[in-house]
């Protein structure tokens, strides 16, 4: 049945205007997953992917993280040519090889960790960041090798090492090869500690499994972003195992700070200055830090001891382990 009678009644001009597509481009707006506010995308980006309404810290890619953290220019990517293999020919519901190709196509990266040597407010550093969009930021052999090469670069140049973790844990598709990386990365940090080169671990949402059980909690200073999920097994798994209801906010960074599992919580917008100030104290090189960041950072939360930590670090003779 045709609608010719309708076309006779409705002028063509009206029909044309009604069918005209909207000229508003896509991607102008986004929704905060915490407060559900509809936000202007460019405003969120200017705010470093932090919700301007509720200060929820959204997840960001590894490259964007490093772009925001390091000074522009003079950057060297470490282990860029490394790519994962499939020696076990692993297959679950999908072949591991196919999962890798899918993740690489979606993210444009070869694996989940990017390590870059650069500067932070003029202070030489080596920084690594996980991309959670790449197979949940899982740690496989390439992630472990890039991490160790980053440590080696720090040892060679005497530069502090900073890592932003965002991972679901060890990569099951690499089986024992992925579990080896827990020991491999931890042993590398032992060499860094012996050389008295600072390692700062920044735990972002989420940091779980084999990553939290290895290098992520081995920082000389462990920093968490607000509201980050941090732990080994997920809260639902724990509740099913112990058959008890977990406390409110269990495994969130605020809960961990209250119970001494992390040293401080720092807003993403303050991370550059805060970490630079701490590294200046730990390396005795305050000249490398901008004047605004050279002073001891303020305390956070209710009675948190970050200012006390900064004063202790500045007063402690770094070569005298017996000093109090």
Swiss-Prot record:
All copies of the CoA carboxyltransferase N-terminal domain together span 28-297
Q: Where are the zinc fingers (C4-type)?
A: 32-54
Cite the entry's keywords alphabetically: ATP-binding, Cytoplasm, Fatty acid biosynthesis, Fatty acid metabolism, Lipid biosynthesis, Lipid metabolism, Metal-binding, Nucleotide-binding, Transferase, Zinc, Zinc-finger
Subcellular location as annotated: Cytoplasm
Alphabetically, the GO molecular function entries are: acetyl-CoA carboxylase activity; ATP binding; carboxyl- or carbamoyltransferase activity; zinc ion binding
Q: Which residues of the sequence carry a binding annotation for Zn(2+)?
A: 32, 35, 51, 54
Please state the Enzyme Commission number of this protein.
2.1.3.15
Does the record bear Metal-binding in its keywords? yes
Q: Which InterPro entries does the UniProt entry name for this protein? A: AcCoA_carboxyl_beta, Acetyl_CoA_COase_Trfase_b_su, ClpP/crotonase-like_dom_sf, COA_CT_N, Znf-ACC
* Keyword Lipid biosynthesis attributed: yes
The pathway this protein participates in, as annotated, is: Lipid metabolism; malonyl-CoA biosynthesis; malonyl-CoA from acetyl-CoA: step 1/1
Under the cellular component aspect of Gene Ontology, which terms does the record hold?
Answer: acetate CoA-transferase complex
**What is one Gene Ontology biological process annotated in the Swiss-Prot or TrEMBL record?**
malonyl-CoA biosynthetic process
This entry's comment on the bound cofactor is:
Binds 1 zinc ion per subunit.
According to UniProt, the reaction catalysed is: N(6)-carboxybiotinyl-L-lysyl-[protein] + acetyl-CoA = N(6)-biotinyl-L-lysyl-[protein] + malonyl-CoA
Which cofactor names does the annotation list?
Zn(2+)
Q: How does it assemble?
A: Acetyl-CoA carboxylase is a heterohexamer composed of biotin carboxyl carrier protein (AccB), biotin carboxylase (AccC) and two subunits each of ACCase subunit alpha (AccA) and ACCase subunit beta (AccD).
The record's function comment reads: Component of the acetyl coenzyme A carboxylase (ACC) complex. Biotin carboxylase (BC) catalyzes the carboxylation of biotin on its carrier protein (BCCP) and then the CO(2) group is transferred by the transcarboxylase to acetyl-CoA to form malonyl-CoA.
For this chain, the family text in UniProt reads:
Belongs to the AccD/PCCB family.
Please identify the protein, giving its name as recorded.
Acetyl-coenzyme A carboxylase carboxyl transferase subunit beta
Species of the source = Methylococcus capsulatus (strain ATCC 33009 / NCIMB 11132 / Bath)
